[in-house]
Amino acid sequence: MMSIKAFTLVSAVERELLMGDKERVNIECVECCGRDLYVGTNDCFVYHFLLEERPVPAGPATFTATKQLQRHLGFKKPVNELRAASALNRLLVLCDNSISLVNMLNLEPVPSGARIKGAATFALNENPVSGDPFCVEVCIISVKRRTIQMFLVYEDRVQIVKEVSTAEQPLAVAVDGHFLCLALTTQYIIHNYSTGVSQDLFPYCSEERPPIVKRIGRQEFLLAGPGGLGMFATVAGISQRAPVHWSENVIGAAVSFPYVIALDDEFITVHSMLDQQQKQTLPFKEGHILQDFEGRVIVATSKGVYILVPLPLEKQIQDLLASRRVEEALVLAKGARRNIPKEKFQVMYRRILQQAGFIQFAQLQFLEAKELFRSGQLDVRELISLYPFLLPTSSSFTRSHPPLHEYADLNQLTQGDQEKMAKCKRFLMSYLNEVRSTEVANGYKEDIDTALLKLYAEADHDSLLDLLVTENFCLLTDSAAWLEKHKKYFALGLLYHYNNQDAAAVQLWVNIVNGDVQDSTRSDLYEYIVDFLTYCLDEELVWAYADWVLQKSEEVGVQVFTKRPLDEQQKNSFNPDDIINCLKKYPKALVKYLEHLVIDKRLQKEEYHTHLAVLYLEEVLLQRASASGKGAEATETQAKLRRLLQKSDLYRVHFLLERLQGAGLPMESAILHGKLGEHEKALHILVHELQDFAAAEDYCLWCSEGRDPPHRQQLFHTLLAIYLHAGPTAHELAVAAVDLLNRHATEFDAAQVLQMLPDTWSVQLLCPFLMGAMRDSIHARRTMQVALGLARSENLIYTYDKMKLKGSSIQLSDKKLCQICQNPFCEPVFVRYPNGGLVHTHCAASRHTNPSSSSPGTRT
């Protein structure tokens, strides 16, 4: 059982004020209506007191009762019950089985003497159905056996409305509209006196203890159930609340939301209707009356009257929070909704959620804390402010007052425990990352992102870079100082870049690469800088660091010029001539850049092609002259040179030929002679100097690429002639000639070749050539025959169509009108359309030159 101080017991009417020194006078009943308190005694007196409430700042209110009047009712029986009908200014008094009407002010009976006789007990209908504001509805348990009666009570008269018979003797009753909640001898029932329908609730033994029936709200009742249970029941016969466990000896009960108050021989117990837990126990002996009057709970012994003063719900909630009883506080706060105006409740409830969130946070219950912070719409800066130095110095934030928690900062909250502090920081990182893109961050995104950056930097978290390369609101001054403090220089560069300070960013990264400052965030930082400059739109910045990146690596550094975005290249923002001039000091980079211009961008400029060829040539010559002789590199560069010489038609051929003289590069010389059309000279070099017969064949192929067949045939005939007019190496050339003929039979004029061949060569030797030549000749002849047949067929179709047109006669008279101009024909000359329409020749000609004019159809 978790206790809470929900009520304070305060004395209202002392014994001396009520009865003086009369020992045998006992209190039988009480009634309270506003400030008016009425007490009925066993000696047939009714006392009227005026209650004055005096609030005390540091504690519960006190009450002072002033006796106004007392009156004897003229009987020798005790006053059993009192009920006030303030609308009528009447007090209903049950004494000696009779209900009398007396004036609430002077306690005089009404002049008419109206009364209800034969009443054992009675109850007022607080949800009346008559609709008459000048009467009250009273339900009595009649002294007649098993009888309930309904009355309308006016200022000076009473009127019976209904009499209901019950299956058992009724012992207690409460009324709501047409519904009676009755405690019979053995059970509780709900009875609708309008329809006569009854519904059993649950059994109850009245011989063991007296029943309790209390109306606690619209269409809901509180009943004393078996086993010491306080049961709730609606007029529908169901329970919408769980029962509360009170003692077996309860003699009275009342409701002061959200609490159920029960009275037994020794104690007053307080249970919550929200979670059914017992919240408070007050010692109170000899009590026999417990009733609630319009929210005021009164208890009484036979000698005195007391008031249970509730502590304000907000004070109760704060007490629970102070005791770290978060769940109970939240349950109580939710239950308080019905008693507090909506707007005020929302403000209060949000604050309670926030306080509860900080309590859970202090206990490292981070999931619960996060949910409470979200539900309570916490200004996240309240949380950030717990962490020293996370809020920017420019932040205008001040903590909520009164404060939401008792902690100055995280050090106090964790008592210096580093592990707890680390957990708290990890939670804040996660929470800020979640809320930064939500409405929670609106208005102070700078504070959130700056705090998040500081946490990431301090924890060396990978998300630091993700934060800086996406949209963020980190304040430059605070963030830069923090990153520098934690030696996050690469991240600082990203921050500069995000704030359009690219020059500062690049310089910082350069310092890292140069070793001036230490930051191991990126092992490929040099490549990152090159990539950054490649996409940088600031030409001055690129030029400022071009030498630096090239000095580090010519092959990588040149990418700042060769890999620029395509849209920027199209704008020609960088002049190639300026770049070439810059790269003269960096030969490898210059070659890469010229390759980019010539091969990648396909710029058709002689200067670039010639320059690249010269650089290739110089590199080849340098490699050949090198003592170490890097064969693989020489071969690669030489292959590039040959490919360029073959593919390009823009370089200066004569200039390169002069550079090649005496260089010992016959293959390159042969390619250049080929570019000049000196094919015989080129082939002579390939055959006689290089003796590379495969290269000679390839030469014929690439030189004739894209040219007409006769040109290719001429090249192959030239090569064959060189083979056949052999010198000392006649045998090798003869073999090469045979191989040439057999491999490329279709490239030769067979008749001309046969005249060139020596008579000593056998047919067997040239069998593949002769077969290929025959096959090519037959294929050409048959292809020509097919084409001729198709042409003849097409001509026949056209001839047939023409004959069809000529086969039908056309009648022409001076009454026939031209379908274009609608004038008659004056001569037998006309144009006929496929649809049969006839037009003048000049109209048809006009229609042909002016297609927009109307026409009867396609002309024939």
From Swiss-Prot:
Keywords for the protein's UniProt record, in alphabetical order: Cytoplasm, Endosome, Protein transport, Transport
Matching Pfam families: CNH (PF00780), Vps39_1 (PF10366), zf-Vps39_C (PF10367)
GO cellular component: CORVET complex; cytoplasm; early endosome; intracellular membrane-bounded organelle; membrane
Subcellular location: Cytoplasm; Early endosome
CHCR repeat coordinates: 564-728
A GO molecular function held by the record: transforming growth factor beta receptor binding
InterPro entries, per the entry: Clathrin_H-chain/VPS_repeat (IPR000547), CNH_dom (IPR001180), Vam6/VPS39/TRAP1 (IPR032914), VPS39/TGF_beta_rcpt-assoc_1 (IPR019452), VPS39/TGFA1_Znf (IPR019453)
Record's keyword annotation contains Transport: yes
GO biological-process terms attached to the record: autophagy; endosomal vesicle fusion; endosome to lysosome transport; intracellular protein transport; regulation of DNA-templated transcription; regulation of SNARE complex assembly; signal transduction; transforming growth factor beta receptor signaling pathway
Domain CNH: residue ranges: 24-297
Family of the protein in this entry: Belongs to the TRAP1 family.
Quaternary structure (record): Interacts with TGFBR2 and ACVR2B; in the absence of ligand stimulation. Interacts with TGFBR1, ACVRL1, BMPR1A and ACVR1B; in the absence of ligand stimulation and to a less extent. Interacts with SMAD4; the interaction seems to be mutually exclusive with the interaction of SMAD4 and phosphorylated SMAD2. May interact with ALOX5. Interacts with RAB5C. Interacts with VPS8, VPS11 and VPS16. Component of the putative class C core vacuole/endosome tethering (CORVET) complex; the core of which composed of the class C Vps proteins VPS11, VPS16, VPS18 and VPS33A, is associated with VPS8 and TGFBRAP1.
Function, as annotated: Plays a role in the TGF-beta/activin signaling pathway. It associates with inactive heteromeric TGF-beta and activin receptor complexes, mainly through the type II receptor, and is released upon activation of signaling. May recruit SMAD4 to the vicinity of the receptor complex and facilitate its interaction with receptor-regulated Smads, such as SMAD2.
Name by which UniProt lists this protein: Transforming growth factor-beta receptor-associated protein 1
Originating organism: Homo sapiens (Human)
Gene expressing this chain: TGFBRAP1
